[in-house]
A protein has these predicted regions:
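C-terminal, surface-exposed recognition/capping segments
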Residues: 32, 108, 124, 131-201
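Extracellular adhesion/carbohydrate-recognition regions
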Residues: 25-120, 156, 172-176, 189-198
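N-terminal Sec signal peptide cleavage junction
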Residues: 20-21
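Positively charged n-region of N-terminal signal peptides that target proteins for export
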Residues: 1-5
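Bacterial N-terminal signal peptides
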Residues: 9-16
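Sparse, context-dependent recognition of short Cys/His-centered cofactor- or disulfide-binding micro-motifs
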Residues: 6, 35, 45-47, 144, ...
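General helical structural elements
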Residues: 6-8, 99, 200
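Hydrophobic core segments of beta-strands in well-ordered, beta-rich domains
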Residues: 61-63, 126-129
């Protein structure tokens, strides 16, 4: 009798334990991919994140390499042309600038052309960054050595997709940024400079 009572007590204990364990497992909050948050400097979506919106789930990445290789340079193109839709400076205008450049003069071998034809890790929706997008790359990734093990830049000017707004010079000049020093400068559209491609996620 005592042995049966002992077995019954063990059985009840096991049932109670399994029930409690099941309830505990059901209450665990398993995050989905949509809940994932990203950080600046993280490798993701074919490049390295340099900008995040307030949700920390969407932003911009820059290519991990100079387009075309370390020594390759490109002209802005469209020399002698005024492209008013390519004067966007702010974050988020790089793609619009790039599309405007290619619509006005679809020249092969230009910075914009090279960016939209770049592909990495299956991603092919790249564009030439705007002035402020380039400045953010400098500020968030290139200023110090914090992310040097993830991405590196040359001490050189990198072309933006932003044409000068100055009425006198807009047909011949575009903005570029030295990513190591962080300062912007204007240069002839025909001058060949290094480029990095950017994409949104």
């Amino acid at each position: 009798m005592k042995y049966r009572l002992y077995l019954f007590t063990c059985f009840i204990s096991i049932v109670f334990f399994l029930s409690s364990y099941k309830n505990t497992m059901m209450s665990v909050d398993v995050p989905s991919k949509g809940d994932e948050e990203f950080t600046v400097g993280m490798k993701a979506f074919g490049g390295v994140i340099f900008y995040l919106d307030k949700t920390k789930k969407h932003g911009l990445v820059v290519s991990t390499e100079n387009i075309g290789g370390s020594w390759m340079t490109y002209p802005w193109g469209c020399y002698g042309m005024s492209i008013s839709d390519a004067e966007g400076i702010d974050v988020g205008t790089g793609r619009l600038n790039t599309n405007a450049i290619l619509s006005a003069c679809d020249e092969k071998g230009t910075a914009a052309y090279a960016c939209v034809n770049y592909e990495n890790e299956g991603f092919s929706d790249w564009f030439l960054p705007s002035l402020e997008e380039l400045e953010l790359i400098a500020e968030n990734l290139a200023y110090d050595d914090e992310f040097s093990d993830v991405i590196q830049f040359d001490n050189a000017n990198y072309l933006s997709s932003t044409q000068l707004k100055n009425k006198k010079h807009k047909i011949n000049y575009a903005w570029s940024v030295n990513l190591i020093e962080g300062y912007p400068t204007s240069s002839y559209k025909s001058n060949k400079q290094k480029i990095r491609a950017v994409r949104a996620f």
